[in-house]
Amino acid sequence: MDTLDEEQLSALKKAFDSFDTDSKGFITPETVGVILRMMGVKISEKNLQQVIAETDEDGSGELEFEEFVELAAKFLIEEDEEALKAELKEAFRIYDKGGDGYITTDVLREILRELDNRLTEDDLDGIIEEVDEDGSGTLDFDEFMEMMSG
């Protein structure tokens, strides 16, 4: 699983500490929902309860900071992945000039050159050969997505 960056961890710690008013080292499940919603995470009460139950490893009914981070990471990382997918979908749509659901390997070559101008023709050939396994000369969105997100 991916990890949170320093900025995200710092924001989570501040939120956790501000709701842990008695400095007991834990927060209630209700508070978790409030914090997640403040951070822009949309989650139903039912899903929240389910995730809290999975994350509350010691069964205390409260979440310690480590448990809270584990829970929040699931949503924050998932949100980042969704944003990446949306951006890639938009980029693909722009390059799919015919609107037929695929781009040619020539177009892919242009995209890769724009992303990294240090790539040699051999590098580009290697990447395209790897991505265009069937040799069709085209890539659909799923293949493009897989290549761009590793």
Curated annotation (Swiss-Prot):
Translocase is among the record's keywords: no
Record-level Gene Ontology MF annotations: calcium ion binding
Domain EF-hand residue range list: 7-42, 43-78, 83-118, 119-150
PROSITE patterns assigned to the protein according to its UniProt record, in alphabetical order: EF_HAND_1, EF_HAND_2
Entry GO CC: myosin II complex
UniProt xrefs under InterPro entries: CALM/Myosin/TropC-like, EF-hand-dom_pair, EF_Hand_1_Ca_BS, EF_hand_dom
Record: residues binding Ca(2+) 2: 132, 134, 136, 138, 143
Residue positions binding Ca(2+) 1: 56, 58, 60, 62, 67
Keyword Transport: no
Key words, A-Z: Acetylation, Calcium, Metal-binding, Muscle protein, Repeat
Modified residues (N-acetylmethionine): 1
Function: Troponin is the central regulatory protein of striated muscle contraction. Tn consists of three components: Tn-I which is the inhibitor of actomyosin ATPase, Tn-T which contains the binding site for tropomyosin and Tn-C. The binding of calcium to Tn-C abolishes the inhibitory action of Tn on actin filaments.
More info: There are two different troponin C in crayfish.
Family, per entry: Belongs to the troponin C family.
Protein name per its UniProtKB record: Troponin C, isotype gamma
